[in-house]
Amino acid sequence: MAASSEEKVSLRTWVAVLGTVLGAFMAVLDIQITNASLREITGGIGSTAVEASWVSTSYLIGEIITIPLTAWLGRVFGVRLYLLVNVSLFLVFSGLCGTAGELTQMIIYRALQGFTGGVMIPMSFTVINTQLPPSKRPVGLVLFGITATLAPAIGPYIGGLLTDSYGWPMVFYVNFIPGVVMLATVFFAIDPQPLNMPLLWKGDWLGTVFMAIGLGSLIAFLEEGQNQDWFTSVFIQRCFTLAVIFIPLFIICELVSKTPVVNLRLLRIRNLGLASAVNFLLGASLYGSVFLLPEYLEQVQNYSARQTGEAMVLIGLPQLLIFPFVPRLMKAFDLRLIVFAGALIFGGSCLLNIHMNPDFGGPQFQIGNVIRALGQPFTIVPLSALATAGLLREQQADGSALFNIMRNLGGSVGTALLSTMITQREQFHDFRIGERITPYDPYVQQFLSNQSIQNLQHSGDPAGALQQAYRMLQSSVQTNSFVMAYSECFLALGVILLLGSVTIWLCKKTKAVGAAAAH
């Protein structure tokens, strides 16, 4: 009977959970929603396409630095005050991003936006695990899971729709709607806590500096490496050097410090450490697939941002039908089995795309997207529960920061490797196909003859018609090379998810969620 009283959750607590989940959703969405509008933002701030990549990179740098700090600063200022200040600043910087007139301004505003927005992701996770009793946490984790899987899927659609209808600044101004709602819910639903300023002064400031330099350099290296041709760039060389030096220094500082900013010792807890490793692989697959599909549709099929977003929606919407069933499954089955099944389904959806051809467009991705949408809810939610099941209440904030930063790092590593893989494999296939194409090949002769006749009918210039036929042949070779490269990238994602599905069995078996509440 005691369990039933523990299971009662007040409306005020649910409002607090929903408010923080809304903030996490907004923070995750803010990457994909702007990626869909980079072309328009580039024109608005007068930058090149390569420079515009910093619109996303600067946000990710700010986010990756702040996530590890949330547990410490949350204890210093209290959850309520810490969230209120950061959400308010996030809205201020969102507004400034919409008014930016040149690249430097945009980079600064986006970095600060990421620094304040990144707070919302682990804090939402912490509120769920500290405010809800064990039997109700699956529901809270489902809500959190929506932010991790639904936001990246629908972000391109929302970004394309807002940009086409109202212009690119609206992708930043739209944050005011959920932001104000979150401010109200946090203000009224979370109790104020006393300040703990001595904890601020006793914090490991040296480790904080090492962490900021190391992780910031790592993200810059990963996100900008492909654009700047990796180690041929002095900037990329310096970023790599800083990351290699300062990340180990940060780890050493945290392990020897009596008051670490990030309690890395928690990773020795078997389930948290292994689940975080699986979360790294899941992040690489989740954000990698969100990166691959739009890139393919825009590069190979010449889709607009809005068309790409419409193709991505099918990844997001079916998840809303699946998520409500996840808590029941978590109460009935081994969490490892649910994650295993979800990873296999997700991986299978990627493997459906390994035999693409140049006619493979949005409609051909639909079946795979729906299957992917069916698998994703069964990965992130039970994996989150598995990671935090053995943590004490006072360890939840640090565990949340570690678990979530691994997904973000996985996403950055995954997209960087996939971006490089596309370029390298396209060049490889272009070379191999080119070896087989000779003027004496009957298929090549037939292609050139047919295209020359068609071109001649429009131009009336025999020499020009033949030259245009050669250009069309070259374009066809390049298109096929890209298609094969993208197919191999989807194969790589499938292998990564298979690896994650196997690794999850190394975790200790935990009681079905909700079983603990009965004791």
PLM segments and residue spans:
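Glycine/proline-centered helix-kink
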Residues: P122, L143, A148-G160, D164, ...
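Transmembrane core module of solute transporters
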Residues: L11-A71, R75, R80-L83, L89, ...
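Cytoplasmic loop-to-transmembrane helix junctions
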Residues: E51, K136-L143, Q395-L402, A485
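Hydrophobic transmembrane architecture of multi-pass small-molecule transporters
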Residues: A2, E6, S37, E51, ...
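Small-residue-rich alpha-helical segments with characteristic i,i+4
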Residues: A151-P156, F365-L448
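Cytoplasmic helix-loop-helix junction between adjacent transmembrane helices
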Residues: Q113, G117-I146
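Symmetry-related core transmembrane helices of the 12-TM Major Facilitator Superfamily/SLC fold
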Residues: F172-F187, M211-G214, C239-F246, E488-W505
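MFS-fold secondary transporters
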Residues: F93-G98, Q113, V186, L352-M356, ...
